[in-house]
Swiss-Prot record:
It comes from Stutzerimonas stutzeri (strain A1501) (Pseudomonas stutzeri). Belongs to the RNA methyltransferase RlmH family. The keyword rRNA processing applies. It is found in: Cytoplasm. Disulfide bonds: none annotated. The keyword Cytoplasm applies. This is Ribosomal RNA large subunit methyltransferase H. Its main location: cytoplasm. It catalyses: pseudouridine(1915) in 23S rRNA + S-adenosyl-L-methionine = N(3)-methylpseudouridine(1915) in 23S rRNA + S-adenosyl-L-homocysteine + H(+).
Amino acid sequence: MRIKLVAVGSKMPRWVEDGWQEYVKRLPSELPLELHEIPLNTRGKNADVARLIRQEGEAMLGKVQPGERIVTLEVHGKPWSTEQLAAELERWRLDARNVNLMVGGPEGLAPEVCARSEQRWSLSPLTLPHPLVRILIGEQIYRAWTLLSGHPYHK
């Protein structure tokens, strides 16, 4: 099983890449965590935002292979504690399908992406900046793995 973070936006600051890589390298080889960036379409003053979101959604879904699980990150999704995320991670592992964690752009996810979602996860009721979301997801996946593995990181 692979976990793929499919996120709209690129050209993140160096500290974001460093933070992401810190957790990717800590995970074991049997739990690879990958980042797939979808370029953010330019939003001009007269942009057709609905069309741009739809295009981003198509690009996101293009990263998903048939049979893979889609989990959308949405403000109105279900909040998971670390223990609940660890339980989900174990279910995903037993299911043996790749997991795609989908993070939309500034206006959220395309309806087509949400319609394909098997699970909706909310990191927080707060609005979080996309750079922090990437690092937070990496850290929480690592923390969930340590909990399942009996590693002392999660106390």
